[in-house]
Amino acid sequence: MSIDSLPPLREVIERHDLMPKKSLGQNFLFDLNLTSKIARQAGDLRDQPVIEVGPGPGGLTRALLAQGAYVTAIERDDRCLEALAEIAAHYPGRLRIIAGDALEQDFTALFPEGPKPRIVANLPYNVGTQLLLNWLLVEPWPPFYSSMTLMFQREVAERIVAKLDSDHYGRLGVLAGWRTQAKIAFDVPPQAFTPPPKVMSSVVHIVPRETPLPCRAEALGQITQAAFGQRRKMLRQSLKSIGGAALLEKTGIDGTRRAETLSVEEFVALANACLP
């Protein structure tokens, strides 16, 4: 069944009264060329498992299925479930719909065997960053997914791929740089969405590193949260609540430096210094 044999998305949205909810961070994609481009960015999807978070009325879902994927779609907006069920009827056995909150989902339990899924999603803007942090800090590593192809606001995308000495370097850049290789694949203009957001969006492609620098994810998460939570303060002050003086002494890192001047390797050293 081709993507063109399904009713137009605008018709589906009107029939099911699916106006996007700001409270859920929803911005629906209508452009079939764009949804197909996002799906292609994830690689060859023929007979491959894919996790999609926040499918809404199913614009990207259609593109993923048309390219041969087996899709597990997680949607917390009950209004969208009937529209997704109609898509599932066109692709028997290829679309699994889970009604629920992705932030509460145990993703590692979704695919207990077989090839690792790819995560492909136009993430709801209000939970996208937290979901990414969860996926970057997940244990064990290598993770449950083989790659991530995700839509973010452009400013968030720049923070994900940021390197030391760049304006956008921060906690996301450290954690993504530690465990993955991330790149901005392409931009998506506001007019591609309904309703159009006020900012440009970007698709980011993320591939896990098989062997990142040895470090406890929980410790690195804590260190980066403290350091960048007060990024304008010196490290001896921003890390004070988590025993920063001892950590800085152990690692030989100057306490008068600020978080934005530390490399990924130096953050890993601080996290490892947390070990008893």
From Swiss-Prot:
Q: Which SMART domains match?
A: rADc
| Primary location class | cytoplasm
Matching HAMAP family, A to Z? 16SrRNA_methyltr_A (MF_00607)
Enzyme class, one word? transferase
- Kindly state one GO CC term assigned in the UniProt record: cytosol
Residue positions binding S-adenosyl-L-methionine: N27, L29, G54, E75, D101, N122
- Reactions catalysed, as given in the entry: adenosine(1518)/adenosine(1519) in 16S rRNA + 4 S-adenosyl-L-methionine = N(6)-dimethyladenosine(1518)/N(6)-dimethyladenosine(1519) in 16S rRNA + 4 S-adenosyl-L-homocysteine + 4 H(+)
Q: State the similarity comment.
A: Belongs to the class I-like SAM-binding methyltransferase superfamily. rRNA adenine N(6)-methyltransferase family. RsmA subfamily.
GO MF term list = 16S rRNA (adenine(1518)-N(6)/adenine(1519)-N(6))-dimethyltransferase activity; RNA binding
Localized where?
Cytoplasm
**Functional note:** Specifically dimethylates two adjacent adenosines (A1518 and A1519) in the loop of a conserved hairpin near the 3'-end of 16S rRNA in the 30S particle. May play a critical role in biogenesis of 30S subunits.
| Organism whose genome encodes this protein | Brucella melitensis biotype 1 (strain ATCC 23456 / CCUG 17765 / NCTC 10094 / 16M)
Does the UniProt entry include the keyword Glycoprotein? no
Which protein are we looking at?
A: Ribosomal RNA small subunit methyltransferase A
Q: Which EC numbers characterise this protein's activity in its record? A: 2.1.1.182
UniProt gene name: rsmA
Record key words, sorted: Cytoplasm, Methyltransferase, RNA-binding, rRNA processing, S-adenosyl-L-methionine, Transferase
